[in-house]
């Protein structure tokens, strides 16, 4: 199999969440607001911290380890057809508890929902969007070439949502069921 898309497998599993609902309700009674999203992010961070082999990537046939746990997510600033979307990349150590992850996730979403706020990913995307198409193709190919050679500047890696351990997005607010997304052939996201 030459590409990631050749090797992907789709799988659906229904999991009973009665105990999880009870836990979320109990914490709500204590004044702590948890969501399914916070629980899923916490579980993923814990899983990656306990199974570091899941935080590896392959570039040019060489297996490498990430220097931290990063989870990217898309945030719709306004729930309308014209609403602007932003992407953020959250860093984790793997030592955070569910409440710390919940706070980080909630504050990041609130901060990035404001149309006045721009993060590093937004700034990079803005620069690229102002570039003529012929130059954009050259820049993207140059970025991928530098990335493949391990020469991409750290500032671009830090701004890139695709240099991440996982990319998770909550689509519940859109009123749709879970989706299966293609794998990215570029960069280092799985």
Question: Where do the PLM segments sit?
Answer:
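C-terminal catalytic/motor cores of large multi-domain enzyme assemblies
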Residues: 1-190
């Amino acid at each position: 199999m030459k590409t990631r898309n050749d090797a992907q497998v789709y799988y659906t599993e229904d999991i009973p969440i009665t105990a999880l609902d009870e836990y979320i309700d109990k914490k709500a009674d204590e004044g702590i607001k948890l969501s399914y999203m916070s629980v899923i992010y916490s579980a993923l961070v814990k899983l990656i911290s306990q199974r570091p082999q899941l935080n590896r990537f392959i570039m040019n046939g060489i297996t490498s380890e990430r220097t931290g746990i990063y989870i990217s997510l898309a945030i719709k600033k306004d729930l309308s057809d014209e609403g602007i979307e932003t992407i953020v990349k959250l860093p984790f150590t793997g030592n955070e508890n569910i409440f710390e992850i919940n706070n980080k996730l909630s504050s990041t979403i609130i901060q990035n929902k404001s149309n006045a706020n721009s993060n590093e990913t937004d700034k990079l995307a803005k620069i690229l969007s102002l570039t003529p198409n012929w130059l954009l193709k050259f820049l993207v190919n140059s970025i991928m070439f530098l990335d493949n050679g391990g020469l991409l500047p750290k500032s671009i890696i830090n701004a890139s949502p695709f240099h991440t351990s996982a990319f998770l997005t909550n689509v519940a607010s859109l009123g749709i069921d879970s989706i299966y997304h293609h794998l990215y052939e570029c960069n280092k996201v799985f």
